[in-house]
């Protein structure tokens, strides 16, 4: 790189994002449990919509995403004018940082929070502020103490990735009420559908003018390969985000498939119930062999080992058995492995392999 050609401040401080592994050298048909994907895939209705979309590939997609926005609004009881759609919830996070953060401002998030918060903050030249958690759970008081007149955005995944822990409505309300006047609370609800009865902050959004929610179709809807997400918030904020959103940021295929997916809530309910059953089973099975985890409300558990060496050794053993899980040292949890909840056979297989590893120690 020429000394005269330099990127904007903060860009070179960004560590390249590393996604979950998808294969193991020398192993055919390895079972991927590293990216929190739905083992049952998308709704059959979503698959049908995907196939139908091939007949209009020569046409530009809509610029206002009206069909998908109205479908989301109908399912969740929202105002469609306050829904914004993006290329995964990542793009909504990026929009928020582009619109409200920048040099000499702070973006706050928790120490084990989603890595994209730091990346998006640095990309706009903002100062990332990492706040300690308490036993791998959000500490509202610590977040409030970290806020200053420079704070513009506070990102909180609830349930959190990679811990699976979450805080209740009272704590969320206290956090929103305690933020500086210029700050926006962004509630990342990527895993909200896995929590029965949880509104992901919708009530707070209606009560206050400083709360925005992001959601994704990559998890329970099984559309990770398509990259579709959405956000909801005060009309004034959504209007700002739409001003920087590209007019054709989502393809017709993305829009029509996601619309069919969100309308099939029977599929969502089945996936949620199956996930809850096997999440509890796997957590209990691992606890019985000395591998604890916090109560997870998402579609994964964070298995804790005695130290980094044991976690890495277990990961290597799992790979020899054709099982791919996620190391989370990048989240400051080097002694842990994040394990996606698969179907029954997958959960039994990973529990057996970890038990085998523990017996060999």
From Swiss-Prot:
<comment type="subunit">
    <text>Homodimer.</text>
</comment>
<comment type="similarity">
    <text>Belongs to the class-II pyridoxal-phosphate-dependent aminotransferase family. Histidinol-phosphate aminotransferase subfamily.</text>
</comment>
<dbReference type="InterPro" id="IPR015422">
    <property type="entry name" value="PyrdxlP-dep_Trfase_small"/>
</dbReference>
<dbReference type="InterPro" id="IPR015424">
    <property type="entry name" value="PyrdxlP-dep_Trfase"/>
</dbReference>
<keyword id="KW-0808">Transferase</keyword>
<dbReference type="Pfam" id="PF00155">
    <property type="entry name" value="Aminotran_1_2"/>
</dbReference>
<keyword id="KW-0032">Aminotransferase</keyword>
<dbReference type="InterPro" id="IPR050106">
    <property type="entry name" value="HistidinolP_aminotransfase"/>
</dbReference>
<dbReference type="InterPro" id="IPR015421">
    <property type="entry name" value="PyrdxlP-dep_Trfase_major"/>
</dbReference>
<dbReference type="GO" id="GO:0004400">
    <property type="term" value="F:histidinol-phosphate transaminase activity"/>
</dbReference>
<keyword id="KW-0368">Histidine biosynthesis</keyword>
<dbReference type="GO" id="GO:0000105">
    <property type="term" value="P:L-histidine biosynthetic process"/>
</dbReference>
<keyword id="KW-0028">Amino-acid biosynthesis</keyword>
<dbReference type="InterPro" id="IPR005861">
    <property type="entry name" value="HisP_aminotrans"/>
</dbReference>
<dbReference type="InterPro" id="IPR004839">
    <property type="entry name" value="Aminotransferase_I/II_large"/>
</dbReference>
<feature type="modified residue" description="N6-(pyridoxal phosphate)lysine">
    <location>
        <position position="219"/>
    </location>
</feature>
<keyword id="KW-0663">Pyridoxal phosphate</keyword>
<comment type="pathway">
    <text>Amino-acid biosynthesis; L-histidine biosynthesis; L-histidine from 5-phospho-alpha-D-ribose 1-diphosphate: step 7/9.</text>
</comment>
<protein>
    <recommendedName>
        <fullName>Histidinol-phosphate aminotransferase</fullName>
        <ecNumber>2.6.1.9</ecNumber>
    </recommendedName>
</protein>
<dbReference type="GO" id="GO:0030170">
    <property type="term" value="F:pyridoxal phosphate binding"/>
</dbReference>
């Amino acid at each position: 790189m020429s000394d005269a050609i330099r990127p904007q401040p903060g860009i070179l401080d960004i560590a390249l994002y590393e996604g979950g592994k998808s294969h193991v050298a020398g192993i055919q048909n390895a079972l991927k449990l590293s990216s929190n994907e739905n083992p049952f895939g998308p709704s059959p209705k979503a698959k049908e919509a995907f196939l139908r979309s091939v007949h209009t590939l020569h046409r530009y997609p809509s610029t206002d995403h009206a069909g998908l926005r109205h479908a989301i609004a109908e399912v969740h009881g929202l105002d469609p004018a306050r829904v914004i759609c993006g290329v995964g919830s990542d793009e909504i996070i990026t929009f928020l940082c582009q619109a409200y953060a920048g040099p000499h401002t702070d973006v706050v998030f928790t120490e084990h929070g989603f890595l994209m918060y730091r990346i998006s903050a640095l990309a706009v030249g903002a100062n990332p502020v990492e706040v300690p958690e308490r036993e791998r759970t959000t500490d509202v008081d610590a977040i409030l103490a970290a806020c200053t007149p420079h704070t513009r955005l506070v990102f909180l995944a609830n349930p959190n990735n990679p811990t699976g822990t979450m805080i209740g409505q009272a704590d969320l309300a206290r956090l929103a009420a305690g933020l500086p006047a210029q700050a926006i609370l962004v509630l990342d609800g990527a895993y909200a559908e896995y929590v029965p009865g949880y509104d992901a902050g919708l009530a707070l959004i209606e009560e206050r003018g400083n709360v925005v929610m992001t959601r994704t179709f990559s998890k329970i809807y099984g559309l990770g390969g398509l990259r579709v997400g959405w956000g909801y918030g005060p009309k004034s904020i959504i209007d700002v985000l739409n001003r920087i959103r590209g007019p054709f940021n989502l393809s017709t295929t993305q829009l029509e498939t996601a619309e069919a997916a969100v309308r099939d809530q029977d599929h969502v309910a089945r996936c949620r119930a199956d996930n809850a059953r096997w999440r509890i089973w796997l957590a209990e099975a691992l606890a019985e062999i000395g591998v604890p985890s916090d109560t997870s409300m998402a579609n994964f558990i964070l298995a804790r080992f005695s130290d980094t060496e044991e976690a890495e050794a277990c990961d290597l053993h799992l790979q020899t058995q054709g099982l791919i899980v996620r190391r989370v040292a990048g989240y400051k949890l080097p002694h842990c492995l994040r394990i996606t909840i698969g179907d029954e056979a997958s959960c039994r297989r990973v529990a057996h392999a970890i038990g085998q590893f523990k017996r060999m120690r």
